[in-house]
Amino acid sequence: MTQYSHVKYTQSPTPSVVSGYSSASRLHSPLPPPANHRRDCLSATTKSYKYLRRLLKFNQMDFEFALWQMLYLFVAPQKVYRNFNYRKQTKSQFARDDPAFLVLLVVCLCVTSLGFAYVLGLSFWQSISFIFYVVFVDCIFVGIIIASFFWAVTNRYLRTNSLEPDIEWGYAFDVHLNAFFPPLMLLHFIQLFFYNWLISQTWFISRFLGNTFWLMGMGYYVYITFLGYNCIPHLKNTRIILIALPIIFLLFLVVTIIGWNATISFVNFYKYRVY
C-alpha cells in the first residue's frame, strides 16, 4: 500500500503545473472567463498608473525621440507607426509608455497659443484663459471623445474576428495626439504670420489661403488617423476613414465659393470664449 501510494503521488502533477494547465486552457476555452479573472483590466490599470506617474519625471523621458516623431509626422508619418508596431512586439502594447510626446505637445500648445493671443491682442488673463481652453478643451477633452469613438468603433466593427485582441484606448488617444500635432503647427503657428496682413482681409486670396490652411490641417488629421489604425494587422476596412477626405475638400470648395473665411470665424470664436 505504501509503495502504491508513493507511485500515485509522484504521478500527480504539481500545483504549478495544474495552474499552468488551467491558464492555458482558459486562454483557448470558448467559455467566458470567470468573474474574478481581470487580467486585461488590471494590466490596463497598471499601465495607466505607470504612465501618469512618469508625467513629472522628466529625467526618465526620451524627448529626443519624441522630437523625432514630431518631425516625421510632417514628412513621413508611416515611420512613426512602424515604431508603434515595434513597441507591440517588445512591450506587448501599442500605446506609448513614455509621456514625452504629450509633454512636448502641451509645451507647443502653450507657446503657439501665446503667439495666437498676442496676434489677437488678448490681455494677460485672457491669454491664460485661452491657453487653458486650447490645452484642456480643444486638445485633451475633444481628444478623449474622439479616441473613445474610434476605440469603440474599431473594437466592435473593424476587428477581423472577435478572438483578436482589443485596440487599447491609450493607443487610440496616441493616434489623436499624433494627428493633432501637424494641424496645430499649421493653424496655430504658421498661419499666424499671414493673419493680420492677409488672411483677415476681405479679399478672395484671403479666404482662399485661410481655408487652405484648414484644408491641410484637417487632411493631415484624417490621414494620420487612418495610418494609425491601418498599421494594426488585425483591423479590416480601415480605409473607410479616408472617406472624410473628399468630404473635407468639397466643404473647402463650397465655403470658399460662398465667401466664408473659416479662419476668421474660428478667431471670432476664440475671442468669444475668453471675453
From Swiss-Prot:
Q: Which GO terms describe its cellular component?
A: Golgi membrane
UniProt keyword Lyase, yes or no: no
Q: Where is this region: Disordered?
A: 1-39
Localization terms from the record: Golgi apparatus membrane
Q: Which keywords appear in this protein's UniProt record, sorted alphabetically?
A: Golgi apparatus, Membrane, Transmembrane, Transmembrane helix
Residues on Cytoplasmic side: 1-99, 151-178, 229-239
One GO BP = vesicle-mediated transport
Q: Which residues lie on this side of the membrane: Lumenal?
A: 121-129, 200-207, 261-275
What kind of membrane protein is this, topologically? Multi-pass membrane protein
Q: Does the keyword Membrane apply?
A: yes
Please list every transmembrane segment annotated in the UniProt record, as residue ranges.
100-120, 130-150, 179-199, 208-228, 240-260
Q: Which residue intervals are annotated with compositional bias (Polar residues) in the record? A: 1-26
Protein task: Required for cell surface expression of acetylcholine receptors.
Q: Which family does it belong to?
A: Belongs to the unc-50 family.
- The protein's name is Protein unc-50 homolog
Q: What organism is recorded for this protein?
A: Drosophila melanogaster (Fruit fly)
Q: Tell me the gene name.
A: Unc50
